[in-house]
Amino acid sequence: MASFCASKFLPGLLMLGLGLAVALASSTPTLSLLKDNLKVMNMPLGDWLHILATNFTNFVASQTLLTLTIFGVASFILRYLYQLFLKPLNLDRALGDVGYVLDGKKKRDVVNDIRRRRKSGDLPPIYPNGWIPLVASQDLVKGDVKYISAVGNEFAVYRGEDGEAYAVDAYCPHLGANMAIGGMVKGNCLTCPFHGWVFEGKEGKCVDIPYQEKGKSVPAQAKVKSWSVIEQNGFVLVWHDVEGREPSWFPENIEEEKWGKMYYHGTTKHTVCAHVEEISENGADCAHLTFVHGAFMGSGNDLRYMGSKLWSWASHSWGGKWEQDPDHKHVGVMTVYHAFSLFGMPIEVTRTESTARQNGPAHVLLSFSLPFGKATIAIGVTPIEPLTQIVTQHVYASRFIPRWLAKSFLYAEYVQFERDIMVWNYKTYQRKPLLVFEDRLISKHRRWYSQFFSENSPKFEDMKKTLDW
């Protein structure tokens, strides 16, 4: 009862106390002296405050309702224009926010029910080998530590004072404390919050035990696993290979010589219930483009309303192909052809061609080329559980592409991607699907993706026995 009263009334009491303090302070000689002597453009601050307060009051009193309405609408328009032209797009959709049919039920109950009853199917290994995005670069500031659970491992990811990103196993080898929870960055090292052991990020060695007797050396076995890290395309990526092999390839960079520097314009993030391979496989499934993505964007992301007559006058026409890059076996390339149609007639000036380059199992660069520049959506898939992925998408554009246009590319991808999520959240994985000739690229893609699994890649059946995720 006492805690309830405190939580209910304490904020109000604090605000009342703050108001009284300000009122009392306003009458003190010190503040009066400050208002009289602190000058702005040779006029005492107190005079400025008096003029502003008087003029604002007189201005509001002299306005009609129509004038105030106009000012209100103008303010709304200015705010909208600021959001559109100056502010990056940032949208974060949690598990259950999209892709589930609630039918009046609580979101949490529906998500848990579907995940429990869903038939997983005969799954391939659950965590691929390769470069795995762990966190967005912008979310890891200097001196910050993030706790990331991904690909069956627990990571402490931090940014040192040198500006570099480091990733080590989260658990301290001393007594098992999670160093990402309360751990502090000291120089380029991570300090355990439990006993203060200090680990450097390059090799994971313990470099200091603060309470150890002077003159004694740190035990050689006092080290934590460190991971190979690169920072590229807006992501901090780690090299994950269950066989312990060193990196054999590296992701491509969004920047190229023709257009130079690429500028950031926004991020979207989704939590998806699917196997990691299914998200990549979507790029080779060209037949689904017409059925899932053909309806006009205005019809939204709910597949149940794609056939609404309200938006039947507008639609998207799609075509595409997928193939392995002949020079880089870890890269898959999808080419997408698109046109906007009105009343069934494609509008020629809207015809575009975009390219999605799948750099390994979990990183994609989706690029749109225009006569005056290039926009690229960098996509990162982070496997946090066998059937749960976090998909993050950043949009970048070259110098002469305005922010509103770059954001429109990302927003279009955002809406279309949420249509896919509604399928993924409910589907099962078919190890041996019934395919027709026109589906042949799906089989081709599965053979390509299999290179990212190896003999010791964890299986879903093994993980279910241990609940080790």
From Swiss-Prot:
Main location: membrane
MF-aspect GO terms: 2 iron, 2 sulfur cluster binding; cholesterol 7-desaturase (NAD(P)H) activity; metal ion binding
InterPro entries in alphabetical order: Cholesterol_7-desaturase, KshA-like_C, Rieske_2Fe-2S, Rieske_2Fe-2S_sf
Keyword Iron-sulfur (UniProt): yes
Residue stretches making up the Rieske domain: 132-238
GO biological process: cholesterol metabolic process
Positions with a binding annotation for [2Fe-2S] cluster: C172, H174, C192, H195
Keyword list, A-Z: 2Fe-2S, Cholesterol metabolism, Iron, Iron-sulfur, Lipid metabolism, Membrane, Metal-binding, Oxidoreductase, Signal, Steroid metabolism, Sterol metabolism, Transmembrane, Transmembrane helix
Reaction(s) the record says it catalyses: cholesterol + NADPH + O2 + H(+) = 7-dehydrocholesterol + NADP(+) + 2 H2O; cholesterol + NADH + O2 + H(+) = 7-dehydrocholesterol + NAD(+) + 2 H2O
Cofactor: [2Fe-2S] cluster
Extent of the signal sequence: 1-25
EC id: 1.14.19.21
Membrane topology: Single-pass membrane protein
SUPFAM superfamilies named among the record's database cross-references: Bet v1-like, ISP domain
Pathway(s): Steroid hormone biosynthesis; dafachronic acid biosynthesis
Transmembrane segments: 58-78
Enzyme class: oxidoreductase
Pfam hit, one: Rieske
Free-text remark on how the cofactor is bound: Binds 1 [2Fe-2S] cluster per subunit.
Cellular compartment(s): Membrane
GO annotations of cellular component type: cytoplasm; membrane
Physiological role: Catalyzes the production of 7-dehydrocholesterol (7-DHC or cholesta-5,7-dien-3beta-ol) by inserting a double bond (desaturating) at the C7-C8 single bond of cholesterol. Essential regulator of steroid biosynthesis as this reaction is the first step in the synthesis of the steroid hormone Delta(7)-dafachronic acid.
Family: Belongs to the cholesterol 7-desaturase family.
PANTHER family reported for this sequence: CHOLESTEROL 7-DESATURASE NVD (PTHR21266:SF32), IRON-SULFUR DOMAIN CONTAINING PROTEIN (PTHR21266)
Listed name of the protein: Cholesterol 7-desaturase nvd
Name of the encoding gene: nvd-Hp
